[in-house]
């Protein structure tokens, strides 16, 4: 994985453009997400553990919003010899190019179809595992339920969805507390007040977090009857839903 340091927002910018997963971001993404998302490494490792437990032979796995391929690699390490196929999708050409380099660095008997495209257009079928790792929050809110419905329909009985997201809270004091804890996490990882402020402005219009209640209601309404929050650190969470 690329280990270049994230300094994208280190200098003052008069105009802050909306955040996008362009070549600049792709080049520092590993560092950016490690320093910005508490528990990211644990989430990635546990996705691999879920794959070991739930992926059935001759089925498909979908990594929707695969970025540099961290989840795909974690899954692939755990499912050797099962004759499965991973479909890894991202709409950023820069991310896909770097993801391909990361995949090529490891030998595996599990095929990966790396697709540069919109996850909303992907046909999901014969799936034992679908991963949405900090991806749903970037879709327009009105498109999220349709995607969850498509995932549910494409999962085999007993298959799972792992959904990781930044979350918000209806309780205002809790929202403020955990948001401040997250900012302290970023400060402790070397981000300046300028970097934090400018990135927040860049994300404001493109990332719209939901509450845990909204996530659970959406999953339940589309048919998932088994749901649990399995990880939370501050305002970041990962959930698992079983069909």
Swiss-Prot record:
A Pfam family of this chain: Methyltransf_25
EC number: 2.1.3.-
Binding site for S-adenosyl-L-methionine: 40, 65-67, 90-91, 118-119, 133, 200
InterPro entries xrefs: CmoA, Methyltransf_25, SAM-dependent_MTases_sf
Keywords in alphabetical order: S-adenosyl-L-methionine, Transferase
Gene Ontology MF term list: carboxyl- or carbamoyltransferase activity; S-adenosyl-L-methionine binding
Biological processes per GO annotation: tRNA wobble uridine modification
Catalytic activity: prephenate + S-adenosyl-L-methionine = carboxy-S-adenosyl-L-methionine + 3-phenylpyruvate + H2O
Subunit record text: Homodimer.
Database matches in NCBIfam families: carboxy-S-adenosyl-L-methionine synthase CmoA, PRK15451.1
HAMAP family for the chain: Cx_SAM_synthase
Free-text function comment from the UniProt entry: Catalyzes the conversion of S-adenosyl-L-methionine (SAM) to carboxy-S-adenosyl-L-methionine (Cx-SAM).
Family: Belongs to the class I-like SAM-binding methyltransferase superfamily. Cx-SAM synthase family.
Name of the protein this chain belongs to: Carboxy-S-adenosyl-L-methionine synthase
Origin species: Shewanella putrefaciens (strain CN-32 / ATCC BAA-453)
Lineage: Bacteria, Pseudomonadati, Pseudomonadota, Gammaproteobacteria, Alteromonadales
